[in-house]
Amino acid sequence: AMALSPTEDGQVAEGDFATNLQKIRYRDGKINGYPSRLHYIADWVNNGIRNGFLEDVTTAYSPYTQRVSLSYMSSHPELYKQLSKSPENVAKMKEIEKSLNGQEFHYIPKDKLPFNGLPWIKNGDIIAITTNTPGLDVAHMGIAFYVNGKLSLLHASSKEKKVVVSKVALGQMLR
């Protein structure tokens, strides 16, 4: 969806899709091997803010923070085809993790998210769901979507194996 978003002048050119997708998925829009892809959401958010296509609205509204401590990919290379046989890629991922570690990100605790959402969360906003899994920052992502006044999540459901709008409010889903 972001790759098809209009430019500031309201235009969307068909040929821009691949270029926009590359800007969104790769560090500063440059493909330079597997580690240049934005695997961690903390890295993706930093890149998006730096390159002007994301805004972190949670920072302005939530006092709750957590520090990033990433290591999952470099400590589980066997789970990634492009890392399992490439010590060089593992070393690069470890450097990337180290560069992100210690950064502070704002979040909303699940017990502080009302079923009807928050006034500053709008339809189409990107929602990242944090995790307690050691070495990871985010467990799941989706798009904010209000249904009958309740904040829902448009997301790729692993259970339903397709993109769905959550049947219950996001606040309820997280509890």
Tell what function each PLM region has.
Residues 125-175:
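C-terminal soluble interaction/assembly domains
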Residues 106-117, 131:
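Short alpha-helix capping/helix-loop boundary micro-motifs
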Residues 44-45, 114, 142:
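Generic detector of bulky aromatic hydrophobic side chains
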Residues 1-102, 128, 146, 155-158:
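Acidic/His-rich structured neighborhood in mature extracellular/periplasmic domains
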Residues 120-121:
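Short, well-ordered loop/turn sites that connect or cap secondary structure elements
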